Design a protein with these regions (language model features):
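Generic N-terminal targeting/processing segments that precede catalytic cores or assembly contacts
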Residues: 1-108, 131-132, 241, 248-287
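Glycine- and small hydrophobic-enriched segments that form the cores of compact globular domains
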Residues: 85, 112-119, 131, 153
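A structural-propensity feature for long, helix-poor, extended segments
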Residues: 145-181, 203-230
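Alpha-helix capping and helix-loop boundary segments enriched in small/acidic/polar residues
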Residues: 84, 113-116, 138, 162-170, ...
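Alpha-helical support elements that line or immediately flank enzyme active sites
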Residues: 123-134, 179-187
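Conserved phosphate/anionic-ligand binding catalytic regions in large, soluble enzymes, centered on
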Residues: 107-125, 169-174
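Functionally critical mobile loop/hinge segments
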Residues: 184-287
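Helix-rich "cap/lid" substructures immediately adjacent to catalytic or cofactor-binding pockets
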Residues: 90-105, 128-157
Length: 287
């Protein structure tokens, strides 16, 4: 998608008095030469697949390595006891992030948003709102266009792959996309969307990609939780009027620079971090 900067989206939205999400929608229509209805239907299909990835979770399923599975169900059982620190929405955000991340590790269908390793973040923040009746499907679709626009800009200006820029490029980008989507859902203006995305990305900048045994399981699944809850907090800050002191495009650019400076061992090679611990090495040998 030819969106080179968040500033470009801001200017297009301001010049025509349209929301952020509509700029992204119209860009998709122009690029793919499709109607608004056709673009919406493709996004609706992605949303339905995302929703299915959350609701079809099987708590008794385990990944082939045995490292992942069941934690989404554990979180829901714990939440049912009404002893959590977080409220009902955040409880379900955590459980959904775990569930979708585990489903990916168990080879079930997910939506890469922007990658499979970060597949739990967007559904974690959006599916509970939809299930609680706090957002309609049409509002969710609009929020997904907002998320897509942010992801497109990050992909153009930096990177979205752990092998290129570490986990900051995957979970960090997903968190920025989710923060922007949530801000959009509550009527945030383009500038607030930008602040939410910038804060979310800054909070996870420098995060390395260090999968145990090279599998998208440990620590990947639980990092989806961090990305999701980070997105919620950044959306609330932006909607409250809290601003990122560094403009969002500059934050994206420096994330790309941090990724390029990151040692090879910390970019999805499983040669550092938890992957290089005695336990991590033992898992690799066993596999």
């Amino acid at each position: 998608m030819a969106l080179n900067s968040m500033q470009e989206i801001f200017e297009k939205a301001a010049s025509r008095s349209i929301p952020f999400w509509r700029v992204v929608l119209e860009t998709d229509m122009e690029e793919r030469q499709v109607t608004e209805e056709q673009s919406m239907e493709k996004m609706r299909a992605a949303w339905h697949a995302m929703l299915e990835s959350a609701v079809s979770y099987q708590g008794d399923q385990r990944s082939r390595s045995g490292l992942v599975g069941g934690d989404g169900a554990r979180m829901r059982r714990y939440a049912a006891a009404d002893t959590t620190y977080s409220g009902p929405y955040v409880q379900e955000v955590i459980a959904t992030a775990l569930s979708v991340g585990e489903s990916n590790a168990c080879m079930r269908k997910i939506v890469a948003a922007p990658t499979a390793g970060a597949c739990g973040v967007l559904p974690a923040v959006l599916v509970p709102l939809y299930q609680m009746g706090r957002a309609t499907e049409e509002e969710i679709l609009q929020a997904l266009y907002t998320a897509s626009g942010i992801g497109a800009v990050v992909s153009f200006r930096a990177c979205i792959a752990g092998a290129s820029g570490g986990c900051q490029a995957e979970i960090g980008t997903a968190s920025a996309m989710a923060a922007g989507a949530l801000t959009s859902l509550r009527g945030g203006d383009p500038q607030q969307i930008g602040h939410a995305a910038a804060m979310a990305l800054k909070n996870l900048m420098g995060l390395v990609c260090d999968p145990v045994a090279g599998l998208v399981e440990v620590p990947c699944v639980k990092r989806n939780v961090v990305g999701s809850v980070n997105a919620v907090s950044c959306a609330d800050m932006a909607l409250a009027g809290v601003e990122s002191r560094i403009p969002v495009d500059e934050v994206i650019d420096c994330m790309g620079e941090v990724g390029r400076r990151m040692p090879m061992e910390m970019r999805e090679t499983a040669l550092a971090g938890p992957a290089a611990t005695p336990t991590g090495k033992a898992v690799k040998e066993r596999m």
